[in-house]
Amino acid sequence: SSFADIEISGIAFHIGSQIKTIEPFTKVFKKTSELIKEINRERQIIKFLDIAGGLGVDYENNIKEFPLNEYVDLIKKFFDVKTLKIILEPGRYISWNAGILVTKVLYIKIHGNKKFIITDCGMNDFMRPALYDGFHKIIPLIEIQSTEKISTDVVGPICETTDKLISSDEFYDVKEGDLLAVLNTGAYGSSMSSNYNVRPLIDEVLISKDTYRIVRKRQTFEESILQETKK
């Protein structure tokens, strides 16, 4: 009532990311439902509800953890889905396992009891591990039976201590020139990539069954600095 000149047509909320249980939504749905009823009772009709807070996935075991059916039932329990427009923001849940980043082993270095596998994938290409220590499994693209029981860091070529894909106590016995697959990069991989360190954006390939097409061509060096050099 303090804002009589403002028309409230909808409510939006975001309660976090990687939510793996239904309980947080139960609490916020209850409060939001009460708020909608109060607003509708006092002055006007709420037309839409934007529900945000990313649904959780398990990167280590490659499974979707969130109880989606319970989530849908909960929405129906607290809100009139026939009259209220519901907008959902599932986040990484819909695309996280749709992407694989392929990188090449450039060099291998041994320093004391530590092994470093340097790849051509930098933190500019895939930011999640460097930005907030996001975990992604890495596997070789050719079958390798043995794993080495030595502390190993798989890193990128950028001169930053955070340019690291994974740390492992036991990693595959790969060699220079081998290709590695960084799994589950479909969410926030491409959108976070940049030209940091004057590195051109990598190409992206869309695969559907037995066909493929390039949806983003690899930048040339000239294209990567175009905004800084054009007159």
Model-derived segments and spans:
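Charged (often Lys/Glu-rich) extended helix/loop segments that serve as interaction or gating elements
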Residues: 74, 83-231
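Active-site loop/helix belt of alpha/beta enzymes
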Residues: 1-108, 199
